[in-house]
Structures are given as structure tokens and as C-alpha cells.
């Protein structure tokens, strides 16, 4: 009779050990996700072609990480996710001007000037055309004050700093990092 109990005890121990490991992994992943990451669906085309979206169900799904900006400030040309305080939504845009800088756009040459000096774009952004709308019209410079001047990559239809002003550091939530859906678009989002 004791011979029959041995396989059951081994089986139960093996199962409990497996369950313990599985729960530890799920707990760790839950902690990491809620502590450091965010999943967001893109529902507009204001950041196309970098991020695409037509509706909540037909847009890129983005994994953003919240850890980087606890240790460093956003860099020029990076994407940031921030809280729009007027509409209480999460928004993703590209950083063009850093705190204390003046941003100007030459609409003809597509050159962005920072404090009067041309700001070269990364090669991956050469095809993006920014339009001198809102506070960038007439070739005038706009101060980012103590915030970040952001633009949407699809400049023709983007609610960005040209209309709403700079993004305050306290509004920044995360750094969009990876397109995780759809499979045909999986990849990193920053240059």
C-alpha cells in the first residue's frame, strides 16, 4: 500500500512546485507591467506614419515604459506619452523643443530651428513634413518655457504644441517604446 502513495506524493509535490513557480512568474510580470509599463491603442492618425490608427480597434498597440523618465529627461525627437489635461486622455507626440528653448519652423525648407540654429533630424524622420500652423505661422519663434514643444508626425491633423502650448514635465507619463500589434508593424518607435 505504501508503494502506491509514493508516486502520488511525488506527483503532488511536483504539481505544487510548478504552481508556486507559475504564480511567482505571474506575480512578477504583473508587478513589472503595472509598475513600469503601459499598453495603449492608437486611435488617430496624428502620428502617422510612425504610429497608425483609425479607431480604437484598428490602430497600433503600443507598449510604453515609465521608468526612463524617472532617471533622465526626454530627448529631442523622442516620442513621449503625456496626459492631455483638457480632454483627460493619453496622447503621444514627438519632442521638438526642450525646456527653455525657442522653436521656429521654416515652412519652405522644412528646417526646424532651435534658438536660431538648425536642428538636424535623424534619418528616420527625413520624410516627415511639419506644417507652420498655429503658433508657428509667419516664421516666428515660440518659447517652450519650462515645458516640451511637441509635434505630431502627421502635422496637417495634429493637436500639438502649435495649438495647446508646451507639455509640462508633470504631464509626461511614459516613453512609447514598442509597437506590439499588429504583427506586421511590430518594432521600436523611437529613432
Residues of each region from the PLM?
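Soluble "head" domains of membrane/secretory-pathway proteins
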Residues: 2-23, 31-191
